[in-house]
Amino acid sequence: ELFPYTRIGRIGFDDTIIAPRPADPCFITDTTFRDGQQARPPYTVKQIAHIFDLLHKLGGKSGLIQASEFFMYSAKDRKAIDTCRARGYRFPRVTGWIRANENDLRIARDMEFDEVGMLTSVSDYHIYLKLGKTRRQAMDDYLRIIERALEWGIVPRCHFEDVTRADIHGFCLPFASRLMELARQASMPVKIRLCDTMGFGVPYAGAALPRSVQGIVRAFTDEAGVPGQWLEWHGHNDFHKVLV
């Protein structure tokens, strides 16, 4: 058991060394206006617009900062979205974030989003204890909403929450493979964000799944066939390991 309730999570090693293969192209998707607000008092619309201008100035002109994501639930959220859209910037693109249910998806459709992030939790901790579902129920529910998004012309960006505590080969890769099938059928991208929700990801050579960052990324690209440009890494609380 890598993640016991009573002790610090363990790191497994299988001595598999993965050669570096940098992303091409390399880009950033910004989450300042979504989870960036969860650690501080919420931004005002004026502050959001100012930060959005700075993001455009910093990397939006070149597309290095490719997109920003926004909540869309409150009147303030929607006003901020309208204000940033009115800037007319090509980058960062304004994208949404929702829970994986049809009511939220309807909000995204009504607000004419062409891409939206969906919370698709993948660890057993989240599936069984937070959602109260089985793996099969969770996957079926996720796929149903993703299919509906594609029907409505919305590119889904599936946020694999808590991926570094998940069963990569038993759940994540089969789920990702189904997403790639849907993408082929719809002739539309289905993007995946790998979310290290608890900060358990490690960059160490020889580290094993599910904690090896390079192992997770390579599994999605090589085993599930996810194109690199559809794949994002979303690190939380990396405790300076990004410097390793």
Where are these regions (language model features)?
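A short, small-residue-rich loop immediately preceding and capping a beta-strand
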Residues: 69, 229-235
